[in-house]
Structures are given as C-alpha cells and as structure tokens.
C-alpha cells in the first residue's frame, strides 16, 4: 500500500511540475504549440477521411447524413476567416474548447468501431484514430492552461450532447457509412479549431489580420 501511495505521490508531483512549467511559458509559445497540434489533428482527420472515401459504396453515399446533422452543428461558429476575425480572443478560445470537448465520446466510439471495421486498411485506420484521441487529449490539456491565462470568458464551454452509441451500424455498409460521416464531422470541426487557434496566434504575435 505504501508503495502505491509513493507512486501516486510521484505522479501527482510530476503532473504539478508539468502544469507549473507550462504556466511559466509565454502565451505566444503556448499558442504556437496549440496551433501546431491542431494542424496535426486536422491533417490526420483529412487523411483518414480520404482513406475511407475510396471504400464507401455508392449506396453508402445515398444513406449518409448531411453535415447539418453533426452533433456540434447547433454551436454558432464563424462561417469564414473574416467572421472569425470579428470575435474576441475569449470567444475564439471558448469555441475551440467547446468543439474539442464535444468530441471526447465520439472519438471513443470511432476507436471502438475501428476495431471491427471491414476495410483493407483497418489496422492503419484504428491506429490513426488512436492518434486522433492522443492529439485531442494533448491539445485539450494545452487549451485548458491557455484559457486559464485568458480569464473566465475563455473558460466557458458550451454543452453539445452526443447521442451516439458504441455500435455505429448493424452491417458493414451502414457501419462504414456512419463511421465516415462521424469522421467527416470531426474533420470539419478540427478545421474550425485550427482556424480559431491560428487567429489567436496571429493576434498574440501582433501579425496583421490579412496575414493570418
């Protein structure tokens, strides 16, 4: 028992040291790191979506839900960069964190479903989904620290309920179709997150808006 408590204490101290170290890093550097991570997230989700697109049968495309049915669609977000540039830093951070948090459970469903997906690249897809989860967790931790530096408004998170399930389809076509749809929604949102963080990075570096 004492050994377990010692290990637990060491882990707690390690986490505290990591948080303290990150808290001492200038906000510009933290935004650079977050922007790099969000870029990786969007790039990986884009690659995954393309991999799946080649194997969705014609009937699958007719069955696929439209983007407005993504579970995050109720969140009011800028439609383009010009609109994003009109928002405050706190609003942009709040939107990015809300979108990222809304994907915690859906990414678990994607990971579980990837293990039984009938696809030539099933193993690769499964590994990449796990990478998405790791990058999302890492980015989320970073944004928690950043929002803490920016104040209460940046820490506000909008609730975006996800009503999915572990089983995203009864047969291979419906599973592949729903898997692709869910991943497409994530790709769309990862692009938004990446765009918001790039605007924040530009502002922190005092770069002209048109250069963002």
From Swiss-Prot:
One of its GO terms (biological process) is response to nutrient levels. Keywords: Disulfide bond, Hormone, Secreted, Signal. One of its GO terms (cellular component) is extracellular space. One of its GO terms (molecular function) is hormone activity. The keyword Secreted applies. Disulfide bonds join 70-185, 202-212. Gene3D superfamilies: 1.20.1250.10. It is found in: Secreted. Residues 1-24 form the signal peptide. PANTHER family: PROLACTIN, SOMATOTROPIN,PROLACTIN. Belongs to the somatotropin/prolactin family. This is Prolactin. It comes from Sparus aurata.
